[in-house]
């Protein structure tokens, strides 16, 4: 599984800018993972749906998570249905996106701002990939910082499975 990080705004996740008055500047974070086998997709889904132990998740807050698809099996089925009949042996079958903002973002304290952030993130993914290629999304609220996870089949404008056209 290959992982690439792209910050939508500066600074890097390691450094937080201090503004006048001591306020910390928040930033958006976008991470992608190329999933090249059904085993990798299944492993990601088991973490995402909490069907395996997830030490970094607070089990008391897990019921606050939201999934667009009720089960990991339905997500896997949706991915398989969207894939072309034949794929290259080294093809990226699915791209897992993680979209969040830094913990300092004041929007985490406001349910309306949080909902708008995730709504706009999903709209961006659907615009970039096509709504039919965004198979499922989840919002995790049981970890340190809320985040959206999306499973996307990287079908390009020509109808070909082509992660490179989206991720480089």
Predicted regions span which residues?
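N-terminal nicking endonuclease/strand-transfer module with a His-rich metal-binding environment
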Residues: 1-168
